[in-house]
Amino acid sequence: MAKLLMTIGSLLVLSLPTAASDKVAAEVLNFSEMDRWVRVTDMICGTVLWEENLEAQRRLPVELCSGDDGKAKIQLYIRIGCTRNKTIVKDGVENGATIQF
């Protein structure tokens, strides 16, 4: 009886969906020829990962929380000038992805 309960318990644990604490490794790439101030936000965990200048052509490795589908969502807020700012939201980010701006 105890063995049966342990087997059922193990199967239940293994059948649970992946938790949001799983991470997706990705890169943010400043493809521009100029340094840019950028705020990188993990939209699933709601945390700001970077909030300062990112040099031209620099790659910034980030670890993002994944959702139930195993994919991440990221937001980039880029200051381009006094009045020209840009917000980029990428949904469905997979492991190894490069998000460029």
Residue locations for each model-derived region?
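Short beta-strand segments within Ig-like beta-sandwich modules, predominantly Fibronectin type-III
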Residues: 51-55
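Asparagine-centered strand-capping/turn motif at beta-strand->loop junctions
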Residues: 26-34
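Sec-dependent signal peptide recognition
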Residues: 2-8
